[in-house]
Amino acid sequence: MFVKNFIHKLKELKQKSLDKFANLLYDYGGYVYDRPCTFIICSLICCLLLTCGFYFKEHEKDIYKLYSISNSYAYETNETINDFFYKSRRCFILVESNVNLLKPKILRELQKFEEGTKDIEVDLSEINECKTNSELPPEQSHVAKELYKTLIQRSEENLKSGKINGSLFDYSDLDENGKSVLSLAGKENNDDTLIEGDNKNDEETSANNNNNEDDNNEDDNNEDDNNEDDNNENDNNNNNEDDNNNDDDDDEDNEEEDEEKQKSLREKLYRKIYEMLKKKKENIVLDENNPNVNFTDYKDDVFYPYQYIPPMLIKADRCKLQNVFGDKNLNIDLREASDGLKKQITYTLEDICEKKYGDCNFSSLFLYYEKGNGYIDYPIKVDNLDFYVNRRTYKEMMFKGILGNMVYEKSGSKYIIKSANAIMTVIPLLNSHTYEPYALAYEKKLIDYVRFYNLDDIIQDEETNDDNDPFIRFHVFTDRSLEDEVDRISKIDNLTRLLLLIGVLLIFMYALFNNVTSVLYRSKPLCAVMGIFCGFLGFLSGSGFLYFLGVKSVPPAETVPFLVIGVGVDDVFVILNSYSLLFMVKDNKKRIQMCLKDSALAITVTTLTNIIAFLISAISPFYSICAFSLFTASSLFFGYLMVLTFLLSFLCIEAKLEKKKRNIFTGTFHLFRSIFMKSSKKNKKENKENNIHDDGDNDNDEKKKDLSLEVKNNEDDYENISIYEWIHNLYLFEESINKKKKNAALVYASNNGMSSNLNNVNEDGFPNPSKIVSMEDVKKRNIKKDDAYINKEDEEGGGYYNKDDNKKKDILGKKQKKNNNNVTLVSKKGEDNELDVYYENLDEKTNDKYKMNNIKSSKLKYDNDKKDGAIINNRPSSDEEYKEEKDKNKINILNDVFNDITIKPNENILLDRGDVIKSSGYDSSYNDLQSSSLPNPSSNEVLNKTTMVYNETDLKDNKKEIKSSKKNVKDIKKSDMIHDDTYDIINSNNKNILLSSNEINNNSNNTNKFNNNSTELATKDTQQFINGHDKNIYLLSSHDNALFYKYIYEEPKGNIGKYFRSLVKNYYVPFLSSRFGKTIVYIMFTIIIAMSIYGCTLMKKGIKYDKAFPVDSYVRRFTTAKIKYFPDFGDFIEVYYFDKHFINKYRGLEKNTKEAASSFLYSDLTDRQIMNSPKINKNVHWENTNLQEELINMHNTLESQEFVTSVANGFTFFLNKNKSSLRKENPQEFYEIFANWLKKDFVGNLFKNDFVFLNGKLVAWRFHYFQKNVDDSEISSKWLKACKQITKLENHNVQMVCFHLSSIFNETDESIIEVTLINLGITILTILVVTAYIIKGFYSCVIIALIIFLIDLCIFGFMCLCGITMNIISMVILVLSVGFSIDHTSHIVQAFSHSMGRTRDEKMKESLHLMIGPVLHSGLSTWFVISTLFFSNKDFTVIFFQTLSLVLFFSITFSSMFLPVLLSSFGPLH
């Protein structure tokens, strides 16, 4: 009971809030109507202010932030690697040709080209990171500064003491505590290799270190002065922590967990005590997240090699040249230097490249020729293609990675290389924090140098291997290439601007096509144009607002204006559709208010659902999608506000023009007419008189066809009806006029005896077709076009009402004004007290002549009351009497349409008035149909006869229906048109068919099934008539019929959407409501759903990272060439091991601890949770033989993978070389052997920089492998998952991390399905809750949810069938599909639930009639504006177009076809 009451109260609250919101919109519409210009100016001013945010626009260039998952390890791993390992910046130069590049002539030119890379000069004005307003370097913590100075001093002491000779290091014996003391063996070697990261010779390194130390001394002294008391105060508190930290390595795993918990509690306690004692938080130098970090924890740490310094500690100001180029003695701060000075100082590759043996460590073909090892004029001869060493320079080479499409032959132990079509050169640059901006500037110059280098003249006469013209192409790829191309696609280039303009032009034409009609003053071209501008202004306002807040632009945001404009125009169609359907409301202000009340709620719901969908996407773990969703949601919101202010104001302006029967071009027309066509006052006066006498001579064509009725009583009742009532009454009226709307036209009656009618029937017992009274016969008898006859009637005393738009008074005797009317009533009192009624149809095709088509109706009997006669001939003395008398002569529209046809009194006939009109051949397209009221059927008076008015067009249309009237009478009988077994064929004689009341009463039971069972249109007159005669006949009063025809049935010409609605009503709705149509729809969508399910089985996920760049990008050309010529040397994958104690300890030195962003939509169980486990990567005993065996097995397993070509693992090389010496599992012996191998072995020397030792333990190491070049996102995305699984050694709690630049895409590929499904689920549930607040009934929400599910299923399946892979772009479109599908679906379901139909079929017809127009137009308009994206040069925009096209197609087809059929079968009836 409580739940029931709660639900009831909730429904009441919902209804009250909706009513309140609707009333608020109603009042707001009137407020805007009174001051539209004010709203236009205010909205434009606000939009202009928000657009100023574009001044603060920034582009996000960090590719890791753009494409990585926020809470997975790709971004974190990259940060960790950069903090503890030095990585080179590699520049790749690939030369491809269809000629042999190893010919001496070509090789010499290529050698000059390579030497040119060393001669590139870069001036310091190219350093963008050191501009005047550039940011200062991040400030280090006090402990980090102290540790950095200590490590520098220790390195200098080792240099002075002679411990370091060259670059070979050695381990001394381990001490008693198990800690190794690093020393040097003093081996003679000319290797000048430097410490990794600096890559300078020892003297340069020492100089740089001294400079860095001197620069930091002043800052350190200041910090010491300010914080000396703080550090002293915390020394005692940190002593216990120091002891605990030193003992962590010896604890067991369970003890470590307890110790960590206790440590965290102590840290919290110490922090509180510290803050209470100090009371000055701003003076705290220690990291707030680690208040117990102390220098004593780090001062005794010893690294191997001695010169190793964690990169995270090197934070020297890189804008000071003495920190970068110490050998140049330049004491210049680039932030303060002038541009002229910057341009005078240059540097070359020699200053920023990684060096080996004193030279830049190139990987190049020309290393083979150094120091006379070979000659260009002779073929290349090597003993190993995988690994070759120049015996004179000791520089290693991998010919399979240098020469592409290599052709060689084996001669003994030598390989003779004869030809190659591609040459790869790799230039390594320094990648430390200090050198990064200078390397970036050089890479920019290098890219320009390589891309525009040309050697076509050298190879013109060379023989090709493909019989095509010879060519030679230069490709380049650097670390900055990714950021540059991401930045380029983030900006709107000229092609995108052109596509946007074309898209706007297309949607502009489509909007005008749907909103401009033949009657210009009813057209709404201004609203169509301003609707497009509303979307564009919404984009400017929404994006500017986010730029104000500091949100950076991302590549997908480039499609936002296309999307927002397309969606914004949808609201225009909904509003104008509602406005056009309220044509019965004559008060423009009221019409605007009712329009806003009906439509604004719908567009509010659709806009809200779209915004919710994008906001939910904004919490996805992908930053680029998050930013894109924010931009779209913000733009849609401001676009919605612009519709309710800017667009509504222009609609009010055009509504006022429509009332004056003017349009936006009227002012211009009058201006030109006043200049070139000045008329005299006399002409104006004559024109005025002509307007009075000529009965509307200057009216437009639409006005000529309106029905002229002097009826105003109860018009407010028709103006206050809702759109749903209008459409319901329209279909009822259609049903009463043409109940089945078939092709036959027949009226028959039965006599008392069948024998008297035998001549009128055929042998089958059906009426003889030759005796059928067709509509053509009626017109031949009734239509008269003789103007002279009409004039004669006027001379004999007849009167007529003349129309005048400006005055309300009698003119020329008996002429009276008729508003909005071009059909005049001519009455004459003739003989036998009969009243002749005529209808004049003014056909004004010329200005000086008008024609009247008059139809003389049947003579109607009436009482000889003088008061009745005075109604026509004489105007009463008072207005009230005139009004009352006029009401008695209301014109009935629904009377019989046959002339001279009567029903004989004794015939057993049941006549439904709707069937009579239907059988007469009358169609709803006729404009003017009038007749008089029937008298009381209980009397024997003659029934009213039919008066009909036709114009030439109607006559032509009617001929088509008459031709189809020859349908078999048997079919007509099945259609309930034959009411009896006997027939009396009605001939063309002027007989009266009389129907006695007795027979009507006797046959009342049989009559009920033929009468209209609807009472929506019943009035007092009809109710009295029905109640008095057992409700056998259902009629409207003459007044109601006239008003109904005027206000409901006949849409005015030029009404927006009129012809489209007529097509829907006359063709589409009958097809969809038929059994055949429903069967076709069910079969078609069953096939579509089955294909979608099959398509889901073909799903592929992922996107190649080069596809994220434009089609014309040099990155894509480089990648294509690399895949072609070097298939076995694809991505260079790095695998890292980090000791968790080491990582956590040194990360505590950072003043601001980095916290990875997270999203609850995704959790990587294989990475984050495992790496956070307290057991992982702690206290690993590398001397354990079992662990060593697992490492070897891991290496073999990885090497056997299909995507791996070669593995370079220094650890396994060491284990295989010294396997017999490592069986004792002695730590001291293990590290001693390891040191000797790194020092003495040539292979070990190559891997020396891959290992980091701290205090006698291996705390970090890495290895590399190449994987195959595969242009398949599904295959390439598997490597990351496989690598993580293979490098996981569970038995020893070892988990390594695999990394490559493409991993930011690959890990996204692995998680995209999970994220998409979660995102879709949350979006659907949230939107359904919002929709349920608006839509009536729980059952309707279930149907909406089902349709959304089917739409998404079809989109997902057909994406796979079309070859579109699942990636972050297609994911956001799938989420967007929920918004689109809920828009279109909710429009139909809401119209269905609010419709007043008696059956599901009727409700379906009414809902389609009302809303299929806005649904179809909104989808097509959106598609037109995005269609131009197909021609974009960026893959993600093409994917956006393809996916969104599927979304729009299935959303429209399901909403306009499957959903109506489903509702007609299972929809909520109440």
Curated annotation (Swiss-Prot):
Its main location: membrane. The chain crosses the membrane at residues 36-56, 494-514, 525-549, 555-582, 588-619, 623-659, 1075-1098, 1301-1334, 1338-1361, 1368-1394, 1400-1431, 1435-1466. It holds the Pfam family Patched. Residues 494-653 form the SSD domain. It is found in: Cell membrane. Disruption phenotype: Repeated attempts to generate a knockout failed. Conditional knockdown results in decreased parasite fitness during asexual stages. Increased sensitivity to saponin, a cholesterol-binding compound capable of penetrating membranes. Impaired digestive vacuole morphology. It is a multi-pass membrane protein. The keyword Cell membrane applies. Keywords: Cell membrane, Glycoprotein, Lipid transport, Membrane, Transmembrane, Transmembrane helix, Transport. Residues 1-3, 35, 515-524, 583-587, 660-663, 674-1057, 1074, 1335-1337, 1395-1399, 1467-1470 are cytoplasmic. Residues 4-34, 664-673, 1058-1073 dip into the membrane without crossing it. GO terms for cellular component: membrane. Optimum pH is 7.0. Inactive at pH 7.4 and 8.0. Residues 57-493, 550-554, 620-622, 1099-1300, 1362-1367, 1432-1434 are extracellular. Glycans are attached at N78, N165, N294, N361, N1218. It catalyses: cholesterol(in) = cholesterol(out). Mutations in the protein confer resistance to three diverse compounds: MMV009108, MMV028038 and MMV019662. Belongs to the patched family. Facilitates cholesterol efflux from membranes in a pH-dependent manner. Required for maintaining normal parasite plasma membrane lipid composition. Required for the proper functioning of digestive vacuole. Required for the viability of blood-stage parasites. This is Niemann-Pick type C1-related protein.
